[in-house]
UniProtKB/Swiss-Prot annotation:
UreD, UreF and UreG form a complex that acts as a GTP-hydrolysis-dependent molecular chaperone, activating the urease apoprotein by helping to assemble the nickel containing metallocenter of UreC. The UreE protein probably delivers the nickel. Belongs to the UreF family. This is Urease accessory protein UreF. It comes from Polynucleobacter asymbioticus (strain DSM 18221 / CIP 109841 / QLW-P1DMWA-1) (Polynucleobacter necessarius subsp. asymbioticus). InterPro entries: UreF, UreF_sf. Required for maturation of urease via the functional incorporation of the urease nickel metallocenter. One of its GO terms (molecular function) is nickel cation binding. The keyword tRNA-binding does not apply. Keywords: Chaperone, Cytoplasm, Nickel insertion. The gene is ureF.
């Protein structure tokens, strides 16, 4: 089987924690779950991350990422704008929305600095506010990364960031973090498959119903002591 090394290294670049888009400063409600006592050790951290990954990310953010990628591939700029707006509207708290806007803006700066695209990059720059989902799907398309592989990289970055937040906020040891990362990483193919099915059905199958996550994210806005911005 032929392996495209350019695609693999591009995937590594997009998924690398060294990519300067600020993901390390966010926990997406995990820190509030720790503060409330829901997450308190390695097993509860793993359960939390797994539940959010399969119950929220796979049902909403992942299919929207695929739809955005397909829109870029078709040069359907109107659909890209609509999907970006849809995703931003699905961010249920100010912290979650600010997070994706800041990271989307940062990835846009990288794309501009590295010359990732011509006319399409101009179209990306015109989207304001710009979500990370839209910017990342664009970068994957421009770098000739297959859709499912780009989504896998996007998902791995999300998982890795959640594990890193657990290490800092609970705290956990490095080995415990790698154990959790390994177990949840193995769920990526299942997540991609579900996301593909939902994306094929359009927005009617996109579902981000997660009241506990929204409540915890709201509480985090006024949490007395915290390490993360979300």
């Amino acid at each position: 089987m032929s392996i495209d090394l350019n695609e693999i290294t591009a995937l590594m670049q997009l998924a690398s924690p060294a990519l300067p888009i600020g993901g390390y400063s966010y926990s997406q409600g995990l820190e509030a779950a720790i503060d409330s006592g829901i997450v308190k050790d390695a097993s509860t951290a793993e359960a939390w991350i797994k539940d959010v990954f399969l119950g929220v990310f796979a049902r909403s953010e992942a299919p929207l990422w695929l739809l955005s990628y397909k829109a870029w591939a078709k040069n359907d700029v109107d659909s890209v704008h609509n999907l970006n707006d849809y995703f931003l509207a699905s961010r249920e708290t100010s912290e979650l929305r600010s997070e994706t806007e800041q990271m989307g803006w940062s990835l846009l700066q990288i794309a501009q600095s590295l010359g990732w695209g011509g006319e399409c990059l101009t179209q990306l720059s015109a989207i304001k506010p710009l979500s990370l989902l839209t910017a990342h799907s664009y970068a994957s398309f421009y770098l000739n990364i297959q859709a499912k592989n780009g989504l896998a990289a996007y998902a791995f970055s999300w998982i890795e960031n959640q594990v890193a937040a657990s290490l800092k906020a609970i705290p956990l040891g490095q080995v415990a973090g790698q154990q959790a990362l390994t177990k949840i990483r193995l769920l990526v193919p299942e997540m991609v498959h579900e996301a593909e099915q939902r994306a094929n059905s359009g927005l009617s199958m996109v579902d981000n119903f997660s009241p506990m996550l929204a409540i915890l994210s709201s509480r985090h806005e006024t949490q007395y002591s915290r390490l993360f911005r979300s």
